[in-house]
Amino acid sequence: MSKIVKVIAREIIDSRGNPTVEAEVHLEGGFVGMAAAPSGASTGSREALELRDGDKARFLGKGVLKAVGAVNGPIAAALLGKDAQDQAAIDQIMIDLDGTENKSNFGANAILAVSLANAKAAAAAKGLPLYAHIAELNGTPGVYSMPLPMMNIINGGEHADNNVDIQEFMIQPVGAKTLKEAVRMGAEVFHNLAKVLKSKGYNTAVGDEGGFAPNLKSNAEALEVIAEAVAAAGYVLGKDVTLAMDCAASEFYDAEKKEYNLKGEGRIFTSNGFSDFLEDLTTKFPIVSIEDGLDESDWEGFAYQTQKLGKKIQIVGDDLFVTNTKILKRGIDNGIANSILIKFNQIGSLTETLAAIKMAKDAGYTAVISHRSGETEDATIADLAVGTAAGQIKTGSMSRSDRVAKYNQLIRIEEALGAKAPFNGLKEVKGQA
């Protein structure tokens, strides 16, 4: 037994300068785990609640002292003396104590920080790296893989102050033989993209996730400049590097009119019309994955999009599924999408996150492990991706330490595991095997 002797939390600062919750779990024998909760900008309406103080005199209302107080008070009291190795029990104690469907009493940011810190402490007590402990919790001990990165090198939407409506334009270095080589390829394309943008007189300031955030003539132009950068880096688009997009379409959906409004280029679409627009882009560019291609409530539209594109490319549900097994089950039962984006803080505990990954995989869906736009130096998602052999990860661009921390952790893990953690590249993407 790894008995919990102390649980504490504090308010720290995330990559956007906003407060977040960091927790520590201390065990007998001196083992300690520490973790911080991330925070999203474009959030699904059914996500677990991120508790903020609302005191405008502190951090413009974004303080997290209530969540910190929940950890230092009732959560700590309930967990003292409990066995950190029983992750499911630890998470269930916090969920039951909170007593709400969406963790609105303590905040998912409080519960998640403790959940992840507990897993880290338990791993330390067993003398295991975190990814190995996660594999055991997942019921797949010793089964690992290195994830194919989706690198968000042009930021738009809620992640940038520009006129590009689609939120993320990503590259996948599918021609790489290892994760380390994939990171190198991504960095080379990123630096060449800076040159391409400068040559066209575009801004090279970066957005929340470390990608460039220029004003462009259209969303398609984002794909065009990336194509130029891939070629300039000496790679073949479609062979060495493929493309992916996160539309975050809920952010430009007009629910009253049931229209998708790309204000940046002055175009308005019906639900099916927007899916047709996306299909047209996939015929012009080697796009192999599209996330949140419609509003989270547009299930009828998603059925059409899945039918139209689901055999050819990966259709990822983020706001659509919010890492929630109840909602994912509905999607699976109705043939909606073929992949789920996995974000710890959408659901609020490690146990529930692992359940969502398992449900997706059992149904033949892929699971893409993801960061949030508000991050810290905490690199737990790297260990989650390897420890569940999820196969894909989204953790931003090749700048900003909050993004690069995850890539660096993956490089370390790959070095430690060698052939035990294969890098399968494009085979991991739904519809591309």
Swiss-Prot record:
Mg(2+) binds at residues 246, 291, 318. NCBIfam families: eno (TIGR01060). The lineage of its organism: Bacteria, Pseudomonadati, Pseudomonadota, Gammaproteobacteria, Aeromonadales. Coiled coil: none annotated. This is Enolase. Pfam families: Enolase_C, Enolase_N. Catalyzes the reversible conversion of 2-phosphoglycerate (2-PG) into phosphoenolpyruvate (PEP). It is essential for the degradation of carbohydrates via glycolysis. Component of the RNA degradosome, a multiprotein complex involved in RNA processing and mRNA degradation. One of its GO terms (biological process) is glycolytic process. It catalyses: (2R)-2-phosphoglycerate = phosphoenolpyruvate + H2O. It comes from the Bacteria. Belongs to the enolase family. It is found in: Cytoplasm; Secreted; Cell surface. GO terms for molecular function: magnesium ion binding; phosphopyruvate hydratase activity. Keywords: Cytoplasm, Glycolysis, Lyase, Magnesium, Metal-binding, Secreted. (2R)-2-phosphoglycerate binds at residues 167, 343, 372-373, 394. It comes from Tolumonas auensis (strain DSM 9187 / NBRC 110442 / TA 4).
